[in-house]
Amino acid sequence: MQGYGMPPHGGYGPVQFTPAHLPGGYVQPGYAQAGYGYAQPGYAQNPMAAYTWSNYGSNINLQQVDNDCTSLRAAMKGLGTDENTIINILTQRNNEQRYMMRQRYQALFQKDLVKELKSELHGHFEDAVVALLDSPYELDCKGLYHAMHRPGTDEEALIEILATRPSYQLAQDKLLFQHLYNKDLVSYVQSETSGHFRKILLALLQCQRHDFTYPINPQELQSEAHQLYRGGAARWGTDESVFTRIFATRSPAEIAYIAQCYQQIAGVDLYTTLKKEFSGNAEKALCGIFYASINPPEYFATRVRDAVQGIGTKDTNLIRVIVSRSDYDLGQIKQAYRKLYNRDMMADVQNDTSGDYKKVLTALLARC
């Protein structure tokens, strides 16, 4: 059985790639494409400026949103709570529509929708419902804080968030983290990590990684592959700074191209080199960046598996992955999960959850 960060069976496999095409398995809706985090001009001045309902106008049916708000209000009025109505509405809307509900609910009833729901719900069901109403930035920040604020750091959650978000989203996350927790995210990560692992995460937080629009430059990327070879397999010891710089600045498509060049130069795949040259959390971080670049659905499938296997459930991680991917590639993640583990992802999630919490996650998984 494969654990976290492992490549697909048989290695990450040959990626048929030419400069005119992105590598197979890379371009997944929402992963590195524009719009994943709904970034809007003006966010740098106000961490929540991106989420004013007027920004969305043309893609939103305001009457439908208002109807949803009225139904949610009715589900929470009087004795008892109509959990099924809450689940049905929130799981059948996308993140943009749900965030609009927060705006319109306040306008219609002068009440904070999230606070209203938190007062009616409890446990992991509450956590999942609130996550559905979070912006991508809020979901990231809560995940990062949860990974660090308790004794024992969840390094793999840090890797998942920092290694798979485009730079513009990490830049917004840094601003919102300060706004929510009155802490500097970079300083907090620095205080909770160490060694080369810390250097990799801090490099990612510099937000210099190229996005999906960055053009492929074959000559430049071949040079990068040579530098990786000279910094690792071709020498005694490892030049960690070369690996950190390349993996923290190159886009997933560029990393896929570099991997092919590296295979031709070194006669061994890049993933094997990472496993050989690094260890511990630094190895996990670089392998995580690599795997998420080559095949995002399989990478996120390993994160779901990590959350549900063994004793106990990593509920915060499970909720974040399912909610954050539900508008994009959750169906592909389910397929990848079956390919990797010969198991049904929905069944495994259902076996590890219960009650209304189970219903929420099941509804999201059934949508795709």
Region spans (language model):
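Structural signature for extended repeat/solenoid scaffolds and their inter-repeat hinge/linker regions
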Residues: 2-368
